[in-house]
Curated annotation (Swiss-Prot):
The lineage of its organism: Bacteria, Bacillati, Actinomycetota, Actinomycetes, Micromonosporales. Its EC number is 1.1.1.37. It comes from Actinoplanes missouriensis. It catalyses: (S)-malate + NAD(+) = oxaloacetate + NADH + H(+). The keyword NAD applies. NAD(+) binds at G9, A10, A11, G12, Q13, I14, G15. Signal peptide: none annotated. SUPFAM superfamilies: NAD(P)-binding Rossmann-fold domains (SSF51735). The gene is mdh. One of its GO terms (biological process) is tricarboxylic acid cycle. Keywords: NAD, Oxidoreductase, Tricarboxylic acid cycle. InterPro entries: NAD(P)-bd_dom_sf. Coiled coil: none annotated. This is Malate dehydrogenase. One of its GO terms (molecular function) is L-malate dehydrogenase (NAD+) activity.
Length: 22
């Protein structure tokens, strides 16, 4: 059972951007 790379990647990129935006 592999998680959706697209969904995980998108969420990861958004979270990463938000983290570095603070």
């Amino acid at each position: 059972a592999e998680p959706n790379v697209t969904v995980t990647g998108a969420a990861g990129q958004i979270g990463y951007a938000l983290l570095f935006r603070i």
